[in-house]
A protein has these predicted regions:
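Periplasmic binding protein-like
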Residues: 1-25, 60
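Bilobed periplasmic-binding protein-like "clamshell/Venus-flytrap" ligand-binding domains
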Residues: 2, 52-88
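Hydrophobic alpha-helical scaffolding
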Residues: 7, 29-32, 54
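Alpha-helical protein-protein interaction elements
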Residues: 8-9, 53, 70, 97-98
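Extracellular/periplasmic catalytic domains that process cell-envelope and extracellular macromolecules
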Residues: 11, 37, 68-70
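Short, solvent-exposed loop/beta-turn-alpha elements that line the ligand-binding surface or hinge
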Residues: 15-45, 49, 79-111
């Protein structure tokens, strides 16, 4: 058992499933050394469909998530919340959905 902070490379389920749960010859973030051929096949199938058939890929991700939950492969103890204080004189500040505690400032303007 271990605790660590990890953020996805990009805002897509494949970043979570591939990095944390897919078995590989070279282990990177699958630190539990999980080796589930059924889960690997579903992840691979979802990756292949992500661009061409998003709905089918989403169904694969739902199935993969069910396998992960049913087998208790991961246990999320908590999710850290972040608070941002933004001056009323500015607008356009948005949070990055893939990275908590990262704010996107490229659209910031004054009111």
């Amino acid at each position: 058992m271990f605790v660590f902070i990890w953020w996805p490379d990009y805002a897509d389920p494949v970043s979570w499933f591939q990095s944390l749960l897919h078995s590989e010859d070279q282990i990177v973030y699958n630190l539990s050394y999980l080796n589930d051929p059924e889960l690997d096949a579903i992840i691979d199938d979802a990756i292949a469909k992500t661009v061409t058939d998003r709905a089918a890929a989403e169904a694969d991700y739902v199935e993969a998530q069910k396998i992960v939950a049913d087998n208790a492969y991961l246990l999320n103890l908590y999710d850290q919340m972040h608070t941002f204080v933004i001056n009323n004189a500015i607008q356009g500040v948005t949070e990055n959905p893939a990275y908590s505690n990262a704010v996107q400032y490229y659209n910031v303007t004054t009111k």
